[in-house]
């Protein structure tokens, strides 16, 4: 076997073994052995080993000792083998010393220069321990405990220890040798061979560790490069797609696919409407026709009743007019399902309205002032029946359902010297005056027939913005819920035959109505009134047109509001006069202003109106759609920098005609940032639109956006160009709170205007009694802002205010004078210093007068 050195560990109370002598200088004889992969030498003298095993010298009871600590092991090159009792013969177990075999190749002098491998393999150790236990158990089974003792005749050539206790003699009776069987020996040899094979495998695996480490470092480097490349792609904005983390995307070019032609064939499928679940169109139309016929019959009955009442009234002569009047044609055409009524208005003083309509044909009435003695001659054609009606004397409760109202006007003037239209110059001669005077007596309106709309003596068109028809209809519509809107037809190109044709269309109730209006030479904003409505609307049962007799009763309650709305929508009177050739050519060059409300906007407005009246009338989805539509259309119209004030005004009139609540809601509607139309208009310095919004009377001027600024505060960003702009912001300041603070920094409109150097805005704010001593969150005042930014003129304006206090300090304890000195504005500092000296000189007098002044203020 290998050279074995038994070292006994010293235990307390036990004398330690003698130290082994030093190795002789002469190299000992190396027995026939083999070197293991880890530097161990195994004795291959199997004959002697087998002989020892047969004699039982190697089989003895050895107590399994714990592995010694590293500190108690001898230092030096080599490897410890803690369980070599089965490999080294004649190991004494009676001394109870822990025997360790020090079989390292570096222990010997001839192998000291070679590189050794440190450590031990626990798997080999466990294998050897198991083999030793099995041999001991098998040997101890027949003999009992303590029967296994080494033989004195055993081979001791492998023991090198000196001073060890002598082996126990065989005749001592401590143990009885039991020769092992051949199977045990074969089993031990197999275990040793398997342990060697496992050692070789482990050694090969250890050799692969550096290669794997190199591969790992290469993969880590590739990962780092890919991570950098991915980050660069994200930075450049390339979409990463839906790939997972660590997944690579390889863009491989693909061969272009051949275009595939698909044959298509249209296939028609016959489906019945009732199978699709669609409503029956014919049934719905039949129901509408029945409703219209019923309304028509009712209107005809009321018309006949009105004619009967008119026949009972005494006739009354009409005095001749002394002022220009307007001749209007009222035509009632009877049809199976529809009634068409044409009417227009009179000018000048308040005139009288015809009280009855004939069931067949139409009547022509002349409206004039009460002064005069003769009535103007009137004529009719075979399609028109003319009647001069007296003034109404009694009120009636007639209700007329009107679906379509058209107004036709001709501008003609023969008495005032204006040129007549060519078509009117060739009119046929009128009837005699006597035939005309006989009409009031008969009260039938029968006169000879002539061409339609023929007039013997054209009269001048009156310069009037609103008609009696609008005044009566508007008053009644405000109460009965009638809303109408005018549409202007295109004018002929001939300026001599200037003609204006207006059309009132509709009586409430359409699902998707449409507002449309055009502004041309002779009619613009006056076409709108408070009783505007939608086009092609079906009449609702609860809505009705007020009768003629009801109009005077409705006027006292509704006239003030109607007149105010009409005055806002009027243009100068010159636009209604007959234009000359020069005026017509100049007016044709004007830009046409058109207002068209989409069906979606009208439907959304009607839905919001229902919601404002009843919050449970709409679902959440319907409310969201209506709100979004109105918000987008209103912001597109009124919140742009180039918004047209006339279009804004017309929309406001339309919203007011629908509902006052709707007008308030739309004007103050805000976007996602909390900005209303007033915020945007003030920011864009579009003060004509601001004026229209303020004139609506429902604008919330103190409403703050999410940034905490109100429209009054945003005037600091605007530039005032004209005197009208100054008047507009003065009106804005008077309607709101000029001392309101922003929610972010606590600044007021005066501080913002001072910081931006808006002298005009500062003057307007001071004129509206803005407080100059208000402090923001940092304790700064408007005077400190002016001193910091070096606005000398604004500083002078602020110091001119008697209540300006220059001794106020901010959070840092700085006054306005200190701020000016720190900013290097010496002129402003001198102004403040002079003001301070003046204040100090009048301080005693002010102290003496303080009680009197305080009592006077109280």
Curated annotation (Swiss-Prot):
<keyword id="KW-0805">Transcription regulation</keyword>
<feature type="modified residue" description="Phosphoserine">
    <location>
        <position position="89"/>
    </location>
</feature>
<feature type="modified residue" description="Omega-N-methylarginine">
    <location>
        <position position="105"/>
    </location>
</feature>
<feature type="repeat" description="ANK 2">
    <location>
        <begin position="707"/>
        <end position="740"/>
    </location>
</feature>
<feature type="modified residue" description="Phosphoserine">
    <location>
        <position position="83"/>
    </location>
</feature>
<dbReference type="Pfam" id="PF12796">
    <property type="entry name" value="Ank_2"/>
</dbReference>
<dbReference type="GO" id="GO:0090521">
    <property type="term" value="P:podocyte cell migration"/>
</dbReference>
<feature type="compositionally biased region" description="Low complexity">
    <location>
        <begin position="421"/>
        <end position="435"/>
    </location>
</feature>
<feature type="coiled-coil region">
    <location>
        <begin position="282"/>
        <end position="313"/>
    </location>
</feature>
<dbReference type="GO" id="GO:0008285">
    <property type="term" value="P:negative regulation of cell population proliferation"/>
</dbReference>
<keyword id="KW-0804">Transcription</keyword>
<feature type="compositionally biased region" description="Polar residues">
    <location>
        <begin position="436"/>
        <end position="446"/>
    </location>
</feature>
<dbReference type="InterPro" id="IPR047184">
    <property type="entry name" value="KANK1-4"/>
</dbReference>
<feature type="region of interest" description="Disordered">
    <location>
        <begin position="488"/>
        <end position="590"/>
    </location>
</feature>
<feature type="coiled-coil region">
    <location>
        <begin position="183"/>
        <end position="234"/>
    </location>
</feature>
<keyword id="KW-0040">ANK repeat</keyword>
<keyword id="KW-0597">Phosphoprotein</keyword>
<dbReference type="InterPro" id="IPR021939">
    <property type="entry name" value="KN_motif"/>
</dbReference>
<dbReference type="GO" id="GO:0043069">
    <property type="term" value="P:negative regulation of programmed cell death"/>
</dbReference>
<feature type="modified residue" description="Phosphoserine">
    <location>
        <position position="323"/>
    </location>
</feature>
<dbReference type="GO" id="GO:0006915">
    <property type="term" value="P:apoptotic process"/>
</dbReference>
<feature type="repeat" description="ANK 5">
    <location>
        <begin position="812"/>
        <end position="842"/>
    </location>
</feature>
<dbReference type="InterPro" id="IPR036770">
    <property type="entry name" value="Ankyrin_rpt-contain_sf"/>
</dbReference>
<feature type="modified residue" description="Phosphoserine">
    <location>
        <position position="547"/>
    </location>
</feature>
<keyword id="KW-0175">Coiled coil</keyword>
<dbReference type="GO" id="GO:0035023">
    <property type="term" value="P:regulation of Rho protein signal transduction"/>
</dbReference>
<feature type="modified residue" description="Phosphoserine">
    <location>
        <position position="86"/>
    </location>
</feature>
<comment type="function">
    <text>Involved in transcription regulation by sequestering in the cytoplasm nuclear receptor coactivators such as NCOA1, NCOA2 and NCOA3. Involved in regulation of caspase-independent apoptosis by sequestering the proapoptotic factor AIFM1 in mitochondria. Pro-apoptotic stimuli can induce its proteasomal degradation allowing the translocation of AIFM1 to the nucleus to induce apoptosis. Involved in the negative control of vitamin D receptor signaling pathway. Involved in actin stress fibers formation through its interaction with ARHGDIA and the regulation of the Rho signaling pathway.</text>
</comment>
<comment type="subunit">
    <text>Interacts (non-phosphorylated form) with NCOA1; NCOA2 AND NCOA3. Interacts with AIFM1. Interacts with ARHGDIA; the interaction is direct and may regulate the interaction of ARHGDIA with RHOA, RAC1 and CDC42. Interacts (via ANK repeats 1-5) with KIF21A.</text>
</comment>
<dbReference type="GO" id="GO:2000134">
    <property type="term" value="P:negative regulation of G1/S transition of mitotic cell cycle"/>
</dbReference>
<feature type="region of interest" description="Interaction with AIFM1">
    <location>
        <begin position="1"/>
        <end position="72"/>
    </location>
</feature>
<feature type="modified residue" description="Phosphoserine">
    <location>
        <position position="375"/>
    </location>
</feature>
<feature type="compositionally biased region" description="Basic and acidic residues">
    <location>
        <begin position="555"/>
        <end position="569"/>
    </location>
</feature>
<keyword id="KW-0488">Methylation</keyword>
<feature type="modified residue" description="Phosphothreonine">
    <location>
        <position position="329"/>
    </location>
</feature>
<feature type="modified residue" description="Phosphoserine">
    <location>
        <position position="356"/>
    </location>
</feature>
<feature type="repeat" description="ANK 0; degenerate">
    <location>
        <begin position="621"/>
        <end position="658"/>
    </location>
</feature>
<dbReference type="Pfam" id="PF00023">
    <property type="entry name" value="Ank"/>
</dbReference>
<protein>
    <recommendedName>
        <fullName>KN motif and ankyrin repeat domain-containing protein 2</fullName>
    </recommendedName>
</protein>
<dbReference type="GO" id="GO:0070563">
    <property type="term" value="P:negative regulation of vitamin D receptor signaling pathway"/>
</dbReference>
<keyword id="KW-0053">Apoptosis</keyword>
<feature type="repeat" description="ANK 1">
    <location>
        <begin position="673"/>
        <end position="703"/>
    </location>
</feature>
């Amino acid at each position: 076997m290998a050279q074995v050195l038994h070292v006994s560990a010293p235990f307390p109370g036990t004398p330690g073994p003698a130290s082994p002598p030093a190795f002789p200088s002469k190299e000992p004889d190396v027995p026939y052995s083999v070197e293991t992969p880890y530097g161990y030498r195994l004795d291959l003298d199997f004959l002697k080993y087998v002989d020892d095993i047969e004699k039982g010298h190697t089989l003895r009871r050895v107590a399994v000792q714990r592995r010694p600590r590293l500190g108690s092991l001898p230092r030096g090159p080599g490897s410890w083998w803690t369980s070599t009792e089965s490999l080294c013969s004649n190991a004494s177990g009676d001394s109870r010393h822990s025997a360790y075999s020090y079989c390292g190749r570096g222990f010997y002098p001839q192998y000291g220069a070679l590189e050794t491998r440190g450590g031990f393999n626990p798997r080999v150790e466990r294998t050897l321990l198991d083999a030793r236990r099995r041999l001991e158990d098998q040997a101890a089974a027949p003999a009992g405990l303590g029967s296994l003792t080494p033989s004195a005749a055993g081979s001791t050539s492998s023991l090198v220890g000196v001073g060890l206790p002598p082996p126990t003699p065989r005749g001592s009776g401590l143990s009885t040798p039991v020769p092992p069987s051949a199977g045990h020996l074969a089993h031990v040899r197999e275990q040793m061979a398997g342990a060697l094979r496992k050692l070789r495998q482990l050694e090969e695996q250890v050799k692969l560790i550096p290669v794997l480490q190199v591969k790992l470092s290469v993969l880590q480097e590739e990962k780092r490069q890919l991570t950098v490349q991915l980050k660069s792609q994200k930075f450049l904005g390339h979409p990463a797609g839906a790939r997972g983390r660590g997944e690579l995307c390889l863009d491989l070019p693909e061969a272009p696919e051949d275009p595939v032609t698909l044959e298509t064939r249209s296939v028609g499928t016959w489906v019945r409407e009732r199978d699709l679940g669609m409503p029956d169109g014919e049934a719905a139309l039949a129901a509408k026709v029945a409703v219209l016929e019923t309304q028509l019959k009712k209107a005809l009955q009321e018309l006949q009743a009105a004619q009967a009442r008119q026949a009972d009234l005494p006739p009354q002569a009409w005095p001749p007019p002394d002022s220009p009047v307007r001749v209007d044609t009222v035509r009632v055409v009877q049809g199976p399902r529809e009634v068409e009524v044409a009417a227009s208005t009179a000018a000048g003083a308040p005139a009288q309205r015809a009280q009855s309509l004939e069931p067949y044909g139409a009547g022509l009435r002349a409206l004039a002032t009460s002064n005069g003695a003769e009535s103007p001659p009137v004529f009719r054609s075979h399609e028109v029946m003319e009647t001069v009606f007296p003034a109404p004397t009694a009120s009636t409760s007639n209700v007329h359902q009107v679906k379509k109202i058209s107004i036709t006007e001709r501008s003609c003037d023969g008495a005032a010297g204006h040129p007549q239209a060519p078509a009117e110059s060739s009119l046929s001669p009128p009837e005699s005056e006597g035939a005309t005077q006989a009409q009031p007596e008969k009260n039938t309106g029968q006169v000879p027939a002539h061409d339609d709309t023929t007039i013997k003596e054209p009269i001048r068109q009156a310069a009037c913005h609103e008609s009696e028809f609008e005044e009566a209809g508007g008053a009644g519509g405000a109460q009965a819920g009638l809303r109408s809107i005018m549409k202007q037809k295109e004018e002929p190109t001939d300026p001599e035959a200037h003609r204006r044709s207006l059309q009132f269309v509709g009586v409430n109730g359409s699902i998707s109505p449409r507002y449309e209006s055009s502004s041309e030479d002779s009619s613009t904003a006056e076409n709108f009134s408070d009783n505007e409505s939608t086009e092609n609307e079906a009449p609702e049962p609860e809505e009705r047109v007020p009768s003629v007799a009801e109009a005077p009763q409705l006027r006292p309650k509704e006239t003030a509001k109607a007149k105010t709305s009409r005055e806002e929508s009027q243009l100068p009177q010159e636009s209604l006069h007959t234009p000359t050739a020069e005026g017509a050519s100049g007016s044709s060059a004007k830009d046409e202003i058109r207002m068209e409300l989409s069906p979606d906007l009208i439907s959304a407005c009607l839905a919001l109106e229902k919601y404002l009246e009843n919050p449970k009338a709409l679902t959440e989805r319907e409310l969201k759609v209506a709100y979004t539509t109105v918000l987008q259309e209103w912001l597109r119209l009124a919140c742009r920098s180039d918004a047209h004030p006339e279009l804004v005004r017309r929309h406001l009139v339309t919203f007011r005609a629908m509902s006052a609540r709707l007008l308030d809601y739309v004007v103050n509607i805000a976007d996602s940032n909390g900005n209303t139309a007033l915020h945007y208009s003030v920011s864009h310095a579009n003060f004509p639109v601001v004026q229209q919004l303020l004139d609506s009377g429902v604008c919330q001027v103190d409403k703050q956006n999410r940034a905490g600024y109100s429209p009054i505060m945003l005037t600091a960003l605007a530039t005032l160009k004209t005197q009208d702009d100054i008047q507009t912001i003065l009106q804005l300041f008077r309607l709101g709170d000029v001392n309101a603070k922003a929610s972010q920094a606590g600044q007021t409109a005066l501080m913002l205007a001072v910081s931006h150097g808006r002298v005009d805005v500062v003057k307007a704010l001071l004129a509206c009694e803005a407080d100059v001593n208000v402090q923001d969150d940092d304790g700064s005042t408007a005077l400190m802002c002016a001193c910091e930014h070096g606005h000398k003129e604004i500083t002078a304006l602020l110091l001119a205010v008697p209540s300006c206090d220059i001794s106020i300090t901010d959070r840092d304890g700085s006054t306005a004078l200190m701020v000016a000195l720190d900013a290097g504005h010496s002129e402003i500092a001198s102004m403040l210093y002079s003001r301070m000296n003046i204040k100090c000189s009048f301080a005693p007098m002010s102290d003496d007068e303080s009680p009197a002044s305080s009592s006077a203020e109280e």
